[in-house]
Amino acid sequence: MALKMVKGSIDRMFDKNLQDLVRGIRNHKEDEAKYISQCIDEIKQELKQDNIAVKANAVCKLTYLQMLGYDISWAAFNIIEVMSASKFTFKRIGYLAASQCFHEGTDVIMLTTNQIRKDLSSPSQYDTGVALTGLSCFVTPDLARDLANDIMTLMSHTKPYIRKKAVLIMYKVFLKYPESLRPAFPRLKEKLEDPDPGVQSAAVNVICELARRNPKNYLSLAPLFFKLMTSSTNNWVLIKIIKLFGALTPLEPRLGKKLIEPLTNLIHSTSAMSLLYECVNTVIAVLISLSSGMPNHSASIQLCVQKLRILIEDSDQNLKYLGLLAMSKILRTHPKSVQAHKDLVLQCLDDKDESIRLRALDLLYGMVSKKNLMEIVKKLMTHVDKAEGTTYRDELLTKIIDICSQSNYQHITNFEWYISILVELTRLEGTRHGHLIAAQMLDVAIRVKAIRRFAVAQMSALLDSAHLVASSPQRSGICEVLYAAAWICGEFSEHLQEPQQTLEAMLRPKVTTLPGHIQAVYVQNVVKLYAAILQQKEQAADTSAAQEVTQLLVERLPQFVQSADLEVQERASCILQLVKHVQKLQAKDVPVAEEVSALFAGELNPVAPKAQKKVPVPEGLDLDAWINEPLSDSESEDEKPKAMFQDEEQRHTKPRAPEADEQELARRREARRQEQANNPFYIKSSPSPQKRYQDAPGVEHIPVVQIDLSVPLKVPGMPLSDQYVKLEEERRHRQRLEKDKRKKKKRERERRGTRRHSSLHTESDEDIAPAQRVDIVTEEMPENALPSDEDDKDPNDPYRALDIDLDKPLADSEKLPVQKHRNAETSKSPEKEDVPLVEKKSKKPKKKEKKHKEKEREKKKKEVEKGEDLDFWLSTTPPAATPALEELEVNTTVTVLKEGQEEPRGEEQDAEEDREQDLEKKPSKHKKKKHKKDKEERPKDKRKSKKKVPPADEEAAEPVENGTLEEEPLPPMSSYILLAENSYIKMTYDVQGSLQKDSQVTVSVVLENQSDSFLKSMELNVLDSLNARLARPEGSSVHDGVPVPFQLPPGISNEAQFVFTIQSIVMAQKLKGTLSFIAKNDEGSTHEKLDFKLHFTCTSYLVTTPCYSDAFAKLLESGDLSMSSIKVDGISMSFHNLLAKICFHHRFSVVERVDSCASMYSRSIQGHHVCLLVKKGEKSVSVDGKCSDPTLLSNLLEEMKETLATC
């Protein structure tokens, strides 16, 4: 054995370690892949050895190779083997490899559960730490579910190192297993007050990350975080807390008033720029939430703006960027405070950093007004000329358009100026936003009726110079403006001064070089112009001119018919045939202008955004159904694809015409020249497309004009925007003078001889009137448009599942799964619980001392709860108790738990068998009698008795507060009610709801065969109502029944469950139903049916939910519940049995019981809270109820009245 160990050690000396692998890779640069492939083969051999040290060394090398991009998933099992090594050095290598290559799709990851659990419970903090670190990288939903309880236990570890890691990994666990958030949250909340600053920082980090997506669930932590903010000196913790308050403030405006003073103090005192920025950010959020609710907030705004100016003027580019970012937030609510710093923002446009320039542009968007719009756009246009790089220039262009068009053009007072700006932007070279300029031209021309004449004139000039725009090297972008120009000139052709000149410009041969969609618009709008010209000529009785225009179209349209674009071909062909038909009519002197114009009658208005989405889907139309069923894979493979129209291969392979010789070419050229010379419409000076003639001989004599596009293009007839700026300034000056004159005359009439600073008049946006009357056309919507819904949230968002109410009491179903041995439950039997009671009898002298300690502890706990209560903390005085509920509130007590003792949980006990087991577990009668005797000996003063906390050896208070009653034996009870019965079958049913499904209940029907026949083919059908509907199998109609999934031999009973969907639960209802079945016996088979009425009571919709006294008291204090009460006389049943009957039949749990008074709680499947105060007199019982729905409460009390009447 010793020789074997020595041999193994010697072998390991010659194994390659990580350093050797790295050195070898560096030495094999030429054949690196081949060398690594050899190394992987060696590693595979090493992994087959039994020695764990060799395996760890191999996994270490694999980890390095994985970093180089090699797949090592094949070694996942070997990695788990190294993870399970006892030596920490090897274990660490295994966890490192797992954290790099394990993911949710790794097959063997399920094998790590027990190993990780073992390492988490290891006495070595380093084993536990490496397991937590590794798990955080490859945690899956299954691992999170199985290990959540173990990690939660580590949050209370004695070592801060482990506590910190456990707190941090809980965030990953919450994302993968959201159900663990509520059980773990109280312990996570405790870590906020951990003595170790590292653990405290970790807890702050986790809660702040959770609250970032769902802040409303963490409002209750505001007092605790406020305490941390005012006491902590850690800047990192302060930044996190202040960020959280920034998210919470919009949800609770009262919080802002609390925060404004400490945040202002921090802004004044801190030297850390990061903390200063977060404070300013949160103050902005506070002021936005308060809006006008805080009278003197202008000082805080000015303070923030001054501090942000310091950040923007700083040489650090990061601080400058953050300052601009925060300034944009202030701009939304307090624009005037930011507009004073316009000079600083404009300076940022000259910054070298493009991101800062872009952020300054975003800020300018909100700083514009009617008064300064022209000035800001003028400066931006200057920057457009100087801009380097197409990205920034495109962003400038976009921002100019956004600034001008925002809020439906509310800041533009002169639309002629805006049209001239758009035309100037068409001169930009290399822009990708030609379509954006075109969209604005179209939008302004359509919406603003007063500007159409001017817009048409500018677009006509643009079409005349279209050859300049179209021949630009980047014409694919900017030539989009020709699309808008052609459409505007065609649609509003009545405003054209020279429509024939524009028509000729649109029919030039150069147009055929434009993109297909632009040519299509040209062709369509040529006809509109043609219709307008025809009307003019016919009105002037100039038939020859009308015929000439028709001839022009007949000659020029064929060039579009031959276009490669199908849409252009189709439009041109249709229009050519139309024009030819018009030409025939003109030859007969038939007037056709009115008929042609009628083709384009009416106006085209803008369509509202998302109009298509708002069109209601017709009834019976299934948008997801196939129109034609797709072929199966086998069919599609067999069939060969066929050409849709003709065999393309044949078209391309047909024999071509023989090439012409030199003489033939010369003859054709001469014929073409003669044709061009005789054609009056041929523009001889227009250069032919270069690509058509560049290889043809004898074209050197044709003059070709080269255009230097580096020189800014000036289209003749287009006024510059600067001229409109001057005109606008003069117009506003005249307007001011007239207004001042009117004011002066008015003052002189009122007060002779007095002067009121007329020279100090300041112009506001409201004072500036637009240059022309603006009639903005509204957007059109489809008929019966549906209201617009917000876009659906991402269903894959991991934070969506964490939107959980953390203040709601924890239900039994929400407990974390804990692995137990099979006899774990039996070890906690009541018989064994009686043992400590016997010990306590011998410690009677200490009972008073224990009571005193518990009172002190209770008082401290109440003070802490008051400090942490959000409403109490935010209000100046604590809220007063409602007089009607004073007695109930006095009765509420707080169960004080010893350290390390788990909080008691209430259990739902609906079935009779569970209750019988509870009866068997109750203490002896002797103990009960002694307990009653002690009660009778107590003083009868209510206040004294209510303030007392029962000692630990008396079991009456604790079990009652948990919702179970342990006194005298209870009569047998069953929740199943008779539904229907005949000679064949007996039906009983019970209705159960679930808090997880707010619109569904499950009806459990027990079917008992009372005959000698064999019952089969059973089918249950219930007639649906408006409020309740039976859930049927997919594809079934409302008349189909639900088959019962079993058969009943004679004397056998079985249970079937049926799901019903319920709309409203506030009223009881009955549904008619039928059970049909076949009864088979020796004589044969018969079809039978049994009619029944299914009764859904309001109690059916309640779910037994435990509630503790502090939460119960808060619920009553809220003031959101409606109140009602009943009183029933002639009650002889004991109070204990009475409460048990209410709990069982009406699904309530006891919150607290004092003598013959008890508070009870239940909750409906739709979240209605139901609170009861049950008081027993000598022969009567009164029930006071509170509920969030008054109708539900009154119906519940009526049902309870029927139950109590039988007691």
UniProtKB/Swiss-Prot annotation:
Indicate whether Transport appears among the record's keywords: yes
Family designation: Belongs to the adaptor complexes large subunit family.
The scientific name of the source species is Bos taurus
Membrane topology per the entry is: Peripheral membrane protein
Biased-composition ranges for Basic and acidic residues?
648-675, 731-740, 795-840, 855-869, 899-908
Write out the ranges of the annotated region (Disordered).
630-695, 731-970
Subunit structure of this chain's protein: AP-3 associates with the BLOC-1 complex. Adaptor protein complex 3 (AP-3) is a heterotetramer composed of two large adaptins (delta-type subunit AP3D1 and beta-type subunit AP3B1 or AP3B2), a medium adaptin (mu-type subunit AP3M1 or AP3M2) and a small adaptin (sigma-type subunit APS1 or AP3S2). Interacts with SLC30A2. Interacts with CLN3 (via dileucine motif); this interaction facilitates lysosomal targeting.
Q: Does the keyword Cytoplasm apply?
A: yes
Q: What else is known?
A: Was originally thought to be a bovine leukemia virus receptor.
Sequence ranges of Basic residues compositional bias: 741-759, 841-854, 923-933
Q: Which SMART domains match?
A: BLVR
Q: Which residues carry this modification: N-acetylalanine?
A: A2
Job description of the protein = Part of the AP-3 complex, an adaptor-related complex which is not clathrin-associated. The complex is associated with the Golgi region as well as more peripheral structures. It facilitates the budding of vesicles from the Golgi membrane and may be directly involved in trafficking to lysosomes. Involved in process of CD8+ T-cell and NK cell degranulation. In concert with the BLOC-1 complex, AP-3 is required to target cargos into vesicles assembled at cell bodies for delivery into neurites and nerve terminals.
A matching Pfam family: AP3D1
Location of Phosphoserine modifications:
S632, S634, S636, S688, S758, S759, S764, S788, S829
Q: Which InterPro entries match?
A: AP3_complex_dsu, AP3D_dom_metazoa, ARM-like, ARM-type_fold, Clathrin/coatomer_adapt-like_N
Q: What is this protein called?
A: AP-3 complex subunit delta-1
Chain coiled-coil ranges = 659-679, 725-752, 846-870
Q: What is its main location?
A: cytoplasm
Q: Acidic residues bias located where?
A: 777-794, 952-969
Identify the stretches annotated as HEAT repeats: 34-71, 142-179, 180-216, 218-254, 257-296, 298-336, 337-373, 375-409, 521-558
| Gene3D superfamilies assigned | Leucine-rich Repeat Variant (1.25.10.10), Longin domain (3.30.450.50)
A GO CC annotation recorded here is: axon cytoplasm
Record lineage: Eukaryota, Metazoa, Chordata, Craniata, Vertebrata
- Which residues are annotated with the PTM Phosphothreonine? T762
Gene Ontology biological process terms from the UniProt entry: anterograde axonal transport; anterograde synaptic vesicle transport; Golgi to vacuole transport; neurotransmitter receptor transport, postsynaptic endosome to lysosome; protein targeting to vacuole; synaptic vesicle budding from endosome; synaptic vesicle membrane organization
* Keywords per UniProt: Acetylation, Coiled coil, Cytoplasm, Golgi apparatus, Membrane, Phosphoprotein, Protein transport, Repeat, Transport
